[in-house]
Amino acid sequence: MHEMSLAMAAIDLAAEQATQRGFTKVTALWLEVGSFSCVDPDTIAFCFEAAAKGTAVEGAQLHFQHQAAEAWCYDCNKTVTLTERGQACPECGGYKLRVAQGDSLRITDIEVS
């Protein structure tokens, strides 16, 4: 369950950013979850709640923004949207693709008080 380590890293980063700016509480956190990130939002929400206990992030609302996967096709020189790994380019049918976005998990916004 790699979601626990991801949740803990998000908690640490959010708490650190809040403290550096003179705030004591994180009230909400927005996470962008790429469709190829292999992260289950329900699982990370569960882990987040458990790992946040006793921290400045405890009780913070967790919001998810989903990001589609996009790749650059070397055959047709276009950026295309993909729905699954190993998929051929929807424009030309080629398989020379490099994922450009949608394979990560990142914090996009932090609300503090």
Swiss-Prot record:
Annotated TM spans: none
Is the tRNA-binding keyword given for this protein? no
Query: What biological-process GO terms show up in the record?
Result: protein maturation; protein modification process
Pfam assignment, any one: HypA
Keyword annotations for this protein, in alphabetical order, are: Metal-binding, Nickel, Zinc
Chain positions recorded as Ni(2+) binding sites:
H2
Q: Write out the residues that bind Zn(2+).
A: C73, C76, C89, C92
Q: Which PROSITE patterns match?
A: HYPA (PS01249)
Recorded GO terms, molecular function? nickel cation binding; zinc ion binding
The protein's job, in short, is:
Involved in the maturation of [NiFe] hydrogenases. Required for nickel insertion into the metal center of the hydrogenase.
Family that this chain belongs to: Belongs to the HypA/HybF family.
Q: What is this protein identified as?
A: Hydrogenase maturation factor HypA
What organism is listed for this UniProt entry? Answer: Aeromonas hydrophila subsp. hydrophila (strain ATCC 7966 / DSM 30187 / BCRC 13018 / CCUG 14551 / JCM 1027 / KCTC 2358 / NCIMB 9240 / NCTC 8049)
The gene behind this protein is: hypA
